[in-house]
Amino acid sequence: FEDLCRALLTPRTAEEMAKLLTDLCTPAEVRTLAERWHVARLLDGSYLSYREIHDATGVSTTTIVRVARFLKQEPHQGYRTAIDRLAEDKDAR
């Protein structure tokens, strides 16, 4: 797992990351990752209910609840780190 994490740090552009994810994941897995990321952004940046997010995205409420738990309660804070860093990058421009 550690080696995979290091490999995921190697792309220097979004295009390079897209190529790596395309090689590494099935199309369904990439869609699932993209859906979870979209849900995390919606949960962080809006006051939509889980039902409204489900209606807007088609993502299951089970997945929405899981993303919300990892975004707000779990100690890993991977979603939070990525969201905050993207905001910092945007502010720096």
Indicate residue ranges for each PLM-predicted region:
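Short, Lys/Arg-enriched anionic-surface-contact patches
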Residues: M17-R36
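General nucleic-acid-binding
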Residues: F1-P11
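Winged helix-turn-helix DNA-binding recognition segment
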Residues: T63, E74-Y79
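Short, amphipathic alpha-helical "recognition" segments used to contact nucleic acids or chromatin
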Residues: L33-L48
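DNA major-groove recognition helix of helix-turn-helix
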Residues: A68-L71
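Short helix-capping/linker segments at secondary-structure and domain boundaries
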Residues: S46-E52, H76
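Short alpha-helical "recognition helix" segments of helix-turn-helix
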Residues: R51-G58, I64
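Intrinsically disordered, low-complexity basic tails/linkers immediately adjacent to helix-turn-helix/homeobox/MYB/SANT
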Residues: Q77-R93
